[in-house]
Design a protein with these regions (language model features):
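Class I SAM-dependent transferase core
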Residues: 1-69, 98-113
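Acidic, metal-associated active-site segment
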Residues: 54, 77-80
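Class I SAM-dependent methyltransferase "Motif I" SAM/SAH-binding loop
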Residues: 72-75
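S-adenosylmethionine
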Residues: 79-81, 88-91, 95-184
């Protein structure tokens, strides 16, 4: 499925941005043969399952956001998609060397602007992110534990979660320092 068909009416971006996203998708498909970036069963529907799933966070990034930190970046979802769509400094944290090289390749070949940190999040000095993102990395309570050094009052966390989202939110009910909001 080509990008305009897959995202018709879902995302309004320039032709240049769509071309960057298409080049990114082509690199995911190419590298998937060597590095397990995404579940192979999701490749036929990559535009909806990965690009659109990540792009839905863009409206939640306020204008003027300075720095976004994407942890457990893996194939770059949602970080690289947000880097293509938002005017913010994107930092991608990925501990796996092969995946970090993949992320660097995408940045170099597509012109998407981002910085890759090939290390575990626990070893990254605080970078002062306005927003922190993650997708399919860990439970909410574990994510907050891993990110403790990165979070300051006012940091917005945008975590893409699946079927267990409500249960994970409920497990955080004892934390009064967190404002929770579930988006469909």
């Amino acid at each position: 499925m080509n990008p305009p068909e897959a995202l018709a009416g879902q995302i309004d971006v320039s032709r240049e941005t769509m071309d960057r996203l298409a080049a990114y998708v082509a690199l995911v498909e190419k590298w998937q043969q060597r590095v397990n970036l995404v579940s192979a069963s999701t490749l036929p529907d990559i535009w909806m399952r990965h690009i659109w799933d990540s792009a839905q966070l863009a409206p939640l990034v306020p204008a003027g956001t300075g720095r976004i930190l994407d942890v457990g970046s893996g194939a770059g979802f949602p970080g690289l998609v947000l880097a293509a769509l938002c005017d913010a400094e994107l930092h991608l944290v990925e501990s796996d060397q092969k995946k970090a090289v993949f992320l660097q390749t995408v940045i170099r070949e597509t012109g998407i602007r981002a910085i890759v940190h090939n290390r575990r999040i626990e070893s990254l000095p605080p970078i002062g992110a306005d927003i922190v993102t993650a997708r399919a990395l860990a439970s909410l309570d574990r994510l907050l534990e891993l990110l403790e050094a990165q979070l300051v009052p006012g940091t917005r966390c945008l975590f893409l979660k699946g079927a267990r989202a409500e249960a994970e939110l409920a497990a955080l009910d004892t934390r009064s320092d967190i404002i929770r909001k579930l988006h469909p």
